[in-house]
A protein has these predicted regions:
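A short beta-strand micro-motif
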Residues: 2-13
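Acidic, low-complexity, intrinsically disordered interaction modules
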Residues: 22-46
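A short, sequence-level motif marking secondary-structure junctions
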Residues: 21-27, 51-56
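Residue-level signal for short segments within beta-strands and strand-turn junctions
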Residues: 8-10, 36, 59
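Short, mixed-charge low-complexity intrinsically disordered segments
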Residues: 39-73
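Short, surface-exposed loop and linker segments with low hydrophobicity and enrichment for Pro/Ser/Thr
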Residues: 1-3, 26-27
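Residue-level signal for glycine
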Residues: 13-14, 44
């Protein structure tokens, strides 16, 4: 599991900053998909969907890196 930090650029409003926990990220067409593997159903589950043209992934960190960073604060 990884934490993807993203910024969604918006023309007429303030940009959105989000964090998405997912196993992997895919670019499909005009979208960025964030997916997690659902072991119960043995298939990927969509946990986030953002427009590729207006989204910037600013960082990616593993669960272990996140826990270590949060433990030092």
């Amino acid at each position: 599991m990884k934490l993807y930090r993203v910024i969604v650029l918006r023309e007429d409003k303030e940009n959105l900053e989000r964090g998405v926990w997912a196993d992997r990220m895919e670019i499909k067409g005009e979208s960025i998909l964030f997916l997690t593997f659902d072991a119960d159903n043995m298939e990927d589950r969509l946990v986030g969907l953002y427009p590729a043209r207006y989204t910037i992934v600013t960082s990616v960190e593993t669960k272990e890196e996140y826990d270590k960073r949060k433990g030092t604060i």
